[in-house]
Swiss-Prot record:
<dbReference type="InterPro" id="IPR042529">
    <property type="entry name" value="IF_2B-like_C"/>
</dbReference>
<dbReference type="InterPro" id="IPR011559">
    <property type="entry name" value="Initiation_fac_2B_a/b/d"/>
</dbReference>
<keyword id="KW-0413">Isomerase</keyword>
<dbReference type="GO" id="GO:0005634">
    <property type="term" value="C:nucleus"/>
</dbReference>
<dbReference type="InterPro" id="IPR005251">
    <property type="entry name" value="IF-M1Pi"/>
</dbReference>
<comment type="similarity">
    <text>Belongs to the eIF-2B alpha/beta/delta subunits family. MtnA subfamily.</text>
</comment>
<dbReference type="GO" id="GO:0046523">
    <property type="term" value="F:S-methyl-5-thioribose-1-phosphate isomerase activity"/>
</dbReference>
<keyword id="KW-0486">Methionine biosynthesis</keyword>
<dbReference type="Pfam" id="PF01008">
    <property type="entry name" value="IF-2B"/>
</dbReference>
<keyword id="KW-0028">Amino-acid biosynthesis</keyword>
<keyword id="KW-0539">Nucleus</keyword>
<dbReference type="InterPro" id="IPR037171">
    <property type="entry name" value="NagB/RpiA_transferase-like"/>
</dbReference>
<dbReference type="InterPro" id="IPR027363">
    <property type="entry name" value="M1Pi_N"/>
</dbReference>
<dbReference type="GO" id="GO:0005737">
    <property type="term" value="C:cytoplasm"/>
</dbReference>
<keyword id="KW-0963">Cytoplasm</keyword>
<comment type="pathway">
    <text>Amino-acid biosynthesis; L-methionine biosynthesis via salvage pathway; L-methionine from S-methyl-5-thio-alpha-D-ribose 1-phosphate: step 1/6.</text>
</comment>
<comment type="function">
    <text>Catalyzes the interconversion of methylthioribose-1-phosphate (MTR-1-P) into methylthioribulose-1-phosphate (MTRu-1-P).</text>
</comment>
Length: 365
């Protein structure tokens, strides 16, 4: 069975799967311009660090295609690209992928504008946006394969021995252009016959685990069990978790990483129980310019996400709410960082050489 599609794109047309409607309804939102994409990202109709970056790039491609006749100079076209992506970046700035996409496409537009050929420039920018979509699918496949091997090694799994893996939030086909990052690792284990069971945390308060990851596991017939966030330690204590793999929205130069709220607690429990803990993300999520996790901006969400469920209040009127969307897990709690170019492991000094790894990956070595 083919994977779910969070993003449907053909030249001039973009549809985003409305993930707020899942798992009760499967419907797509027609995105005609960057303003509509900004709203979809802000409201979390589309979410997942890779997916929002790809959605933003393709929304720009759609709007550029529609405005071919009105952008008559390279200067106007470059200014348009710069303004549109700057605006979309404000939707969810914690995820480094969105900023990486913004910088990449804006730099491409600036370079192409020097030709003086506005038609060729617009075509080149659109093709650049489309290339990001294809690249993400390929990188997720590589993350899955490399991650599956890394988890089996970390668990000391013998030939033919299957493992039980825990994850949180949603990092599969719904969070990327296809296949997934952390859930892609689980998917690769299943496809190779090495997965016994996947455990997904519900991931309060937005329930991406229960609404989305459980939906993907059932859709693809991968053996999975849904648990509440506060059950993870008890499951580890029973010896029912061989490894943990989660996603990341930003990985700092020292290996600290921001991910969905609750990841830090999961990592602390994993360390106590001796369970190897990995994060899986494309190289675009690695941010060597951010020194440590203390420098990562953490988005805070509306309190209603905690006080209400399915539109109905479930908490006392007047109670204060703190609702950060992410937390930062210290690198000391991490076993490795899985990317499409390989796994970053601690060096002899006990540090993750993120900056060196990124430089080598971007240099093609």
């Amino acid at each position: 069975m083919s994977s779910l599609e969070a993003i449907r794109y053909a030249r001039g047309n973009l549809e985003l799967l409305d993930q707020l409607a899942l798992p009760l309804e499967t419907k797509y939102i027609d995105v005609r311009d960057c303003n509509a994409c900004w709203r979809c990202i802000k409201d979390m109709n589309v979410r997942g660090a890779p997916a929002i970056a790809i959605a933003a790039a393709l929304a720009l491609a759609v709007e550029l295609e529609a405005k071919r006749g009105t952008l008559t100079t390279c200067e106007a076209a470059e200014a348009f690209v710069r303004e549109r992506f700057d605006h979309m970046y404000t939707s969810r700035p914690t995820a480094v992928n969105l900023g990486e996409a913004k910088n990449r496409i804006q730099a491409l537009a600036k370079r192409l504008s020097e030709s003086g050929d506005v038609s060729g420039m617009i075509e080149g920018v659109i093709e650049g946006c489309e290339a990001m979509h294809a690249e993400d699918v390929a990188s997720c496949r590589a993350i899955g394969d490399k991650g599956a091997a890394a988890l089996l090694r970390a668990c000391g799994a013998k030939d033919g021995e299957n493992i039980k893996v825990m994850t949180c939030c949603n990092t599969g086909s719904l969070a990327t252009a296809g296949y997934g990052t952390a859930l892609g690792v689980i998917r690769a284990l299943w496809e190779s016959g090495r997965l016994e069971r996947a455990y997904c945390l519900e991931t309060r308060p937005y329930n991406q685990g229960s609404r989305l990851t459980a939906y993907e596991l059932v859709y693809e017939k991968i053996p999975g069990t849904l648990i509440c966030d506060n059950m993870a330690a008890a499951l580890m204590a029973r010896g029912d978790v061989d490894a943990i793999v989660v996603g990341a929205d930003r990985v700092a130069a020292n290996g600290d990483f921001a991910n969905k709220i609750g990841t830090y607690s999961l990592a602390v429990n994993a360390k106590h129980h001796g369970v190897p803990m990995f994060t899986a993300a494309p190289v675009t999520t690695l941010d060597p310019e951010t020194a440590t996790g203390a420098d990562i901006h953490i988005e805070e969400r509306p309190g209603e996400e905690v006080t209400h469920s399915l539109g109905k209040r479930v908490a006392a009127e007047g109670i204060d709410v703190w609702n950060p969307s992410f937390d930062v897990t210290p690198a000391a709690l991490l076993t490795g960082v899985i990317t499409e170019h390989g796994v970053i492991e601690k060096n002899a000094s006990g540090l993750f050489p993120v900056a060196d790894f990124v430089a080598q990956a971007k240099g093609g070595t």
